[in-house]
Amino acid sequence: MTLLEKINETRDFLQAKGVTAPEFGLILGSGLGELAEEIENPIVVDYADIPNWGQSTVVGHAGKLVYGDLSGRKVLALQGRFHFYEGNTMEVVTFPVRIMRALACHSVLVTNAAGGIGYGPGTLMLIKDHINMIGTNPLIGENLEEFGPRFPDLSLIHI
């Protein structure tokens, strides 16, 4: 099965569950997974039930997709994500974001637990830039025109 076929199958599965056109995607990392419990009129789907979806193995990641209303907006929240360091391929790591795009979501907020000098527990930090030093990236492989150009403009990614 091609990546596009997997994306279409997963999108169709979620749409059949009532998950449609979220205004915002939330990828909730360690410490913020409970935010999904604030979502009203939730549709909750376990990762294990979603076709082509990876499995979250990090302690504290509930492994659930939650869709509904948060502050009057339709959101799709992911309680946990998949990490490259866990042995996942970039296809698995990026698959949830591709699904959000397939569902017509155009804005995604990614959270994670991070440490640094001068920051205490619970401090919010905003990423302004990044350098990819892992030796691979999700652009390797077939370019899916449905998801944009081969080399997207990243100059405004951290807004």
Question: Where are these predicted regions, by residue range?
Answer:
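Metabolite-binding pocket within alpha/beta catalytic cores that recognizes anionic/polar moieties
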Residues: 1-152
